[in-house]
Amino acid sequence: MKEIGLEGHGISPNAVSEPFRLFTDEAVQQIRAEVFSEEVLKDCRFASTFNKQMVRGMGPARAPFTYAAWNSPELLAAVSKVAGIDVVPSFDFEVANINISVNSGGKPVTEPKKDDGNPLSDGLSSVAWHYDSFPFVCVVMLSDCTDMVGGETALRTSSGEIMKVRGPAMGTAVVLQGRYIEHQALKALGGRERISMVTCFRPKSPHVRDETVLTGVRGISHKSEMYTQYTEYRLEILEERIRAKQKSERTRVAARRPFDTEEIRQWLNEQKAFIESTLEEMTGE
């Protein structure tokens, strides 16, 4: 974050990673089999202005391998190490978002356009500039990128400059602190298909600031299911914070330290803000 002028922003000093291996080719094929199963395609397809073909909310029943993989201790340790903070999937509906683009007439592109110094001069932006709804995202490529050119992520620094981050190859991942960095995806040219898998993450500790919003996913979700999972995890965070505060208060009493009115008022106001931010996301739209 310091290198792009955003030191102190977000919940981790790490902004974005280079691609790293996260899934084997065999694991990718198993995930693809679940994504393109009849049940998933029937119940879990969505579209938005960003992407006309998405699969979301597969859940453990329809996609047991995908769900188990993203919740495995080994994968969580790998993603947390790259993120620079312990993270967990935001909630089940975000395991995972599959973006599907198929070009039946696609011709391989072997030579990229000349770089004239403007990273976006070719006009090949795939998604508009935006901030993510969740603190971190992990993007995994599920397609063979051999004949593809492009597909990078463009980041806007605090000075307004544009940086490009190389996109992942099949089975590799890129981790981005997208809630706090303005970014956009650039189009990939060549190849018959481009299928990417995006899983959203939040801090594991209930005591770390969590500024998750539902703005970007409310219109592409089964709301009852999503709101149930969102409410559950927010209440769990609140419960753990209250239990921790109760424990610290008992310790204070046992040590015969005086009651700190200002400290407890500050803590209560923090929980009030947390509840109010949760309420703001629970819209009827």
What do these predicted regions represent?
Residues 93, 123-135, 161-162, 168-169:
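A short beta-loop-beta micro-motif enriched in histidine and acidic residues
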Residues 98-130:
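Conserved short histidine dyad/triad with adjacent acidic residue
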Residues 259-285:
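C-terminal non-catalytic accessory extensions
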Residues 2-13:
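N-terminal accessory alpha/beta regions
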Residues 14-97:
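Signature of the catalytic double-stranded beta-helix
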Residues 148-253:
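Catalytic core of Fe(II)/2-oxoglutarate
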